[in-house]
Amino acid sequence: MSTEVSGLIECRPGARLWGPDDEDSVWHSAIDLFLLNNGNAYAGLACLFGIRNYFGFRPLAEGRGLPGDASEDLRTEYASYGGPPDVHGTTWITWAEVAAADWKETDSSGSRSRASVAGDETNWGPVWSVMRILGELHGADHVRLVVWFH
């Protein structure tokens, strides 16, 4: 049985304008992952999120759950997949974390780098491009990708 990834990129534009603690600094959905990434290569899922990690990557963002401050759009989309009974591995990662990752780091065999399985030249490239642009506009800590698996 295959594992599919779904999710959304969110941003918090008010945080840069008014500060992260302002009541108007809430998360907004930006774009559905489905529109940017048409693949579910397991090596990429392993190195990013620890899903099907037969490769021995040190995941960047494993098992963090659904953010408590997720946007209403994200909560609605997540619920449409059945929520916790029907999905697993829910997690999130900020653009700041993606940008700071060691993309030369390899799996346990030393044969696959993060860049080769989930870098700019893979199906993840469009996701990173959108997050990069939103990070330039709103700040790297105020852009995140929230994903779940089914």
Placement of each model-derived feature along the sequence:
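Conserved GNAT acetyl-CoA-binding A-motif
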Residues: 143-145
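Acidic (Asp/Glu-rich) sequence patches and key acidic residues
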Residues: 1-139, 149-150
